[in-house]
Design a protein with these regions (language model features):
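Short, Lys/Arg-enriched N-terminal segments with co-localized hydrophobic residues
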Residues: 1-11
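Periplasmic/extracellular, small/polar-rich flexible segments of pilin-like filament-forming proteins
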Residues: 2-4, 71-166
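N-terminal single-pass transmembrane signal-anchor helix
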Residues: 12-43
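Residues at secondary-structure transition points
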Residues: 17, 49-53, 57, 108, ...
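Conserved alpha-helical elements of the SDR catalytic core
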Residues: 39, 46, 66
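Alpha-helix exit/C-cap motif
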Residues: 49-53, 60-82
Length: 166
């Protein structure tokens, strides 16, 4: 007959002892590693798409502002036009507290403008690269190298995917 102290002091001798073996723990670690190797890149890609979508929204807002200025002044670059109200994406990043994902810039002549969103920080990993839109609603990616009015259907598809996510 075993005493209470004997069975408690050496649980390996107890036939009813429970626990996990090293193999079982290694299987769990391997499964977690596989799940994480899929989940983390998908989460990062989701963040990049979300930030890009916000930048496009800010670009369209700035485009509407440019059109209002043209309506008032008859020119996109009239000296009376105030500085653009949006210079970063997200908009609140300029006042501090948030990471700047894109820098928004505007170049204009009397009858044309191009709004450009240049990726910053983690957004530089975005395959769409620098985004731009002009007064004719021509959308471009990768710094203007591929645009929505290209002759190549695959280029137009790539631009559509970057600007709409579809």
């Amino acid at each position: 007959q075993q005493s209470f102290l004997t069975s408690r002091s050496n649980p390996m001798k107890n036939a009813n002892s429970r626990g996990f073996t090293l193999i079982e723990l290694m299987i769990v670690v391997a499964i977690l590693a596989i799940v994480m190797s899929v989940a983390i890149p998908n989460y990062q890609a989701y963040g990049i798409r979300t930030n890009r979508s916000e930048a496009i929204s800010n670009m369209l807002e700035l485009s509407q502002w440019m059109e209002r200025q043209f309506t008032v002044f008859g020119s996109y670059n009239d000296p009376g036009i105030a500085a653009p109200p949006i210079t970063t994406s997200p908009k609140t990043a300029a006042s501090g507290g948030a990471t700047i994902n894109y820098l928004l810039s505007n170049s204009s002549t009397a009858i044309t403008y191009t709004i450009t969103a240049t990726p910053q920080a983690n957004q530089t990993n975005d395959s769409c690269g620098t985004l731009s839109i002009d007064q004719a609603s021509r959308e471009c990616i990768t710094g203007g190298a591929i645009c929505s009015d290209d002759a190549s259907a695959s280029n137009r598809t790539q631009v559509r995917q970057c600007f709409t996510g579809k």
